[in-house]
Amino acid sequence: MRSSDQLSARQRDILGFIEEFTQEHGYPPSIREIQDGLRISSTSVVAYNLRALESKGLIDRDGRVSRGIKIKNMTPMPLSRAQGGRVPLLGVITAGQPLPNPEDTSTTAVEMIEVPVDLAPPEKLQNVYALKVRGHSMIDALIDDGDIVLMRYQETADNGQMVAVRIEDDNAVTLKRFYREGDKVRLQPANVTMEPIYVDAARVHIQGRVVGVLRSMW
């Protein structure tokens, strides 16, 4: 059981806010949302207290993404968004050469999109988020520019799975099929006109796996 011993009042408030926000929305809050939700004077104060919570073993953080906060041993509960067949649209992903991630997921207004029941039953939408596709590298997999991919958050993948990948140092995010080849990873486009991308495995961080597609009709 998680202990709250030696927590300041502010740290208890932040921990409670993160847990309530995550249960309600299905994804963790950004630092800005914590600041606004608790009326804290600055994001630096929030960041300081998040570091304290992490050092006390109560949360895990991935500082490379804006919503990289996880409460340890938190038991998932049914999400209100799942009952409505809705998932958060968290930004844009490139289906082409990797580009710096253009999304800004630190805003307080997160767009929610409807997922048809015949595509995914509401109870299957736990830990699922959406990204809008930019580019044509996955066209042979029937994913084109303007489509929306549904991503199940996970940090590992099997060979051949279609994943969102962040490339370290470049801070680039791309949508490709994943293949581990020794100490390299091959990021394979589904477009015969495009070449695969080879990256050191240590620089590749999986952000999620494609579990569905909402196709643009434009």
Swiss-Prot record:
GO terms for molecular function: DNA binding; serine-type endopeptidase activity. The active site is at S137 (for autocatalytic cleavage activity), K176 (for autocatalytic cleavage activity). Keywords: Autocatalytic cleavage, DNA damage, DNA repair, DNA replication, DNA-binding, Hydrolase, Repressor, SOS response, Transcription, Transcription regulation. Signal peptide: none annotated. Its EC number is 3.4.21.88. One of its GO terms (biological process) is proteolysis. It is an enzyme of class 3 (hydrolase). Homodimer. Belongs to the peptidase S24 family. This is LexA repressor. It comes from Roseiflexus sp. (strain RS-1). The lineage of its organism: Bacteria, Bacillati, Chloroflexota, Chloroflexia, Chloroflexales. The gene is lexA.
